Amino acid sequence: MGIGEFFHKIGVGFTRLGENSIPHTTQAKRYGNWGEDEFVYHIRTHLPNCQIKRNIVIQTLEGNAEIDCLILYNNKLFAIEIKRWKGELTECDGQFVQRKLDRWTDEWHTKIQKSPFRQLSRAIYLLRKQVTEKAWINSIVYFEDADRISINNKNTWFDNVYSLTEYIQNNGQVSYGNNAQAFFNQCIPADYLYSNSWDKSLHCVICDDSLAFRISNKVVHKSDISTISIEHHWSYDEVKIEAKNGTRYAVNIENGSIYVIDNGYKYRYALCKLDYIHLGN
């Protein structure tokens, strides 16, 4: 290694230290993500023939939204909002009153939560603006950890996965022809970024043109990729790619970055600040 290359590597290393990382993940958000993971695991176990897309990204001129889980089963579509709210839940005037008992102080704490039914209804409305196909969407709110639930409307909701999967199997509006599958195919699931530093994660949409790797005289595009793991060194990253067809690639990148769309805004994040990427496509 020449003296010029040595100082170049030193400079690159210090530049990498100051690169942008993904935002801090709150404990509440992390707790909710774990709940979604557990929910999807149970759904796949009880409905092995269903198709699932997580964290459907919706970006329209009228607003942005996200649907936690979209399930396709026997030509029926189910949009599911997952709420991992503990304690006692009471619907009141279009909102939810959440009361939790503090196990350390033995005191009750009250919090007003927005209606997940309204949240899901808005998301479905915007999704119909984004997707050109026409299909019936059955809406369901799933409460994962509540001790007691009091709801006085006719919206569909569940608090145990067994009743929910039974409902999906035996109920729900069926879409005409192949419309449900066509609609499902157009829905965009979020990509997932993860950083070991402070256990940070982000659901977003990676811009297609920022995730292309030239390897052995070919270009591996975002649409080809399933997952990416990144091993960090002082002046470069060892990027390990697993393609959808099972092929594995590895490439060293000095100071790479990706661009993502998150809630309608574009951000740049350095690969040196990421450890794992899961593509939702």
Can you annotate each of these PLM segments?
Residues 80:
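Conserved beta3 VAIK motif of the Hanks protein kinase fold
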Residues 1-65, 73-77, 88-91, 98-281:
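Surface-exposed interaction regions that form or flank ligand-binding interfaces
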